[in-house]
């Protein structure tokens, strides 16, 4: 199914990269969200929502746009003041941010009633929080395996990097004491360590490749 001009413009401006927020709702645990674009534009290919680094949830384009606008509102909330990183999101703030997301989403879907978007956003967030806590969501949400989503992936959802060389000059070099080490004894275990500038370049390349977790 083809996407509209408004959807295409929004996708190019706001959905071509990985979007991320971490929520700390009342109750146990946090909700860490990575929204990853599919390989190609189109309504038939779902976005991937990576929930707490483990659960994979497909998201259609309209809900991806709604969630992206809510993420943007939250990001602005936490960067608009000197003490922004320590601010608590009170109920009145949450409702205001949700309303900002609804207004922004209506610029893409002007014929959709605000009430419908408010209900959709509330249902989406309630469902994601429930899934993150291992509870039943208010509506049935289809989860995916990596094998199911592989044809649509624009990049791997995780990249593990070896920070330190395991050995140098034939002697053990790593200062970590991990219970299980899968880097020991590997052919690249004695590779030359990167400089700070090289690490920054590597991380920037991973960001541009849409790999959400490192």
Task: Show which residues each predicted segment covers.
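Conserved alpha-helical substructure of the radical SAM core
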Residues: 108-109, 116-127, 131-214
């Amino acid at each position: 199914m083809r996407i509209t001009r408004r959807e295409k413009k929004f996708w190019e401006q706001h959905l071509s990269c990985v979007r991320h927020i971490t929520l700390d709702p009342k109750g146990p645990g946090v909700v860490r969200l990575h929204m990853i674009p599919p390989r190609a534009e189109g309504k038939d290919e779902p976005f991937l929502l990576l929930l707490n680094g483990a659960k994979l949830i497909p998201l259609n384009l309209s809900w991806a746009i709604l969630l992206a606008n809510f993420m943007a509102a939250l990001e602005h909330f936490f960067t608009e003041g000197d003490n922004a990183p320590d601010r608590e999101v009170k109920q009145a703030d949450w409702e205001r941010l949700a309303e900002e997301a609804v207004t922004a989403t209506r610029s893409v879907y002007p014929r959709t009633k605000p009430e419908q978007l408010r209900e959709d956003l509330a249902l989406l967030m309630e469902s994601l929080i429930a899934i993150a806590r291992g509870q039943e969501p208010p509506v049935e949400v289809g989860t995916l395996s990596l094998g199911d989503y592989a044809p649509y992936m624009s990049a791997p959802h995780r990249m593990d990097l070896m920070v330190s060389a395991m050995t140098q000059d034939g002697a053990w070099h790593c200062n970590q004491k991990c219970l299980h080490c899968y880097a020991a004894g590997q052919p690249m275990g004695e590779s030359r360590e990167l400089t700070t500038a090289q690490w920054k370049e590597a991380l920037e390349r991973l960001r541009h490749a849409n790999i959400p977790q490192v």
